[in-house]
Curated annotation (Swiss-Prot):
May be important for peptidoglycan remodeling. The lineage of its organism: Bacteria, Bacillati, Bacillota, Bacilli, Bacillales. It comes from the Bacteria. This is Uncharacterized membrane protein YwnJ. The keyword NAD does not apply. It is found in: Cell membrane.
Length: 140
C-alpha cells in the first residue's frame, strides 16, 4: 500500500510540474503539456522572492512545501530511513525544478529551497518525536 501511495504522490507531483499551468489544472481541470527542448537554464538560478507577495503565488509555494513534506513522509515509510527519505526528496525537488524548465514553466532554485522547507519540517518533527519517545522511555 505504501508503494502505491508513494507512486501516486510522485505521479501527482510530476503531473503538477509538467503541466503547462498548475492553476489551469486545478481551476479548469485541464492538463496540457508544452515541451521545450532548449530551455533557458539560467532561469534556474533566479532567486526572486517578490513573487511571494502575491497571495495566489504564496499559497502555491505552501503547496510546494506541503508536497515535499508528504513525499518525505511516504519515502520514510517506504525506506525506513529518515536521512534517505530526506535526501531522496531533496534530489526529487531539484529534479522537478529543472524538469519544469523543459515544460515552459518557471523552475528555479528558490522553489527547491521552498521544497526543502517541507522536507526539513518533516525531518525536524521526526527528530523531535523520536527524542520525545526516547525521553519517555528513559523516564519509565
Amino acid at each position: 500500500m505504501n508503494r502505491l501511495l508513494l507512486a501516486g504522490w510522485i505521479f501527482f507531483i510530476l503531473l503538477s510540474v509538467c503541466t503547462e499551468s498548475f492553476s489551469g489544472m486545478v481551476v479548469s481541470q485541464t492538463v496540457a503539456f508544452h515541451f521545450q527542448p532548449h530551455p533557458d537554464l539560467s532561469q534556474f538560478l533566479v532567486m526572486d522572492f517578490t513573487e511571494l507577495t502575491v497571495p495566489e503565488a504564496f499559497i502555491q509555494k505552501i503547496g510546494h512545501a506541503f508536497s515535499f513534506f508528504v513525499l518525505t513522509y511516504l519515502l520514510w515509510k517506504q525506506r525506513g530511513s529518515i536521512r534517505s527519505a530526506a535526501a531522496g526528496s531533496f534530489a526529487f525537488a531539484f529534479f522537478t525544478e529543472v524538469l519544469q524548465l523543459f515544460f515552459s514553466r518557471n523552475g528555479c532554485i528558490r522553489d527547491v529551497l521552498i521544497d526543502a522547507v517541507g522536507i526539513g519540517l518533516f525531518y525536524g518533527l521526526y527528530v523531535l518525536a523520536k527524542r520525545r519517545k526516547q525521553e519517555m522511555y528513559e523516564k519509565y
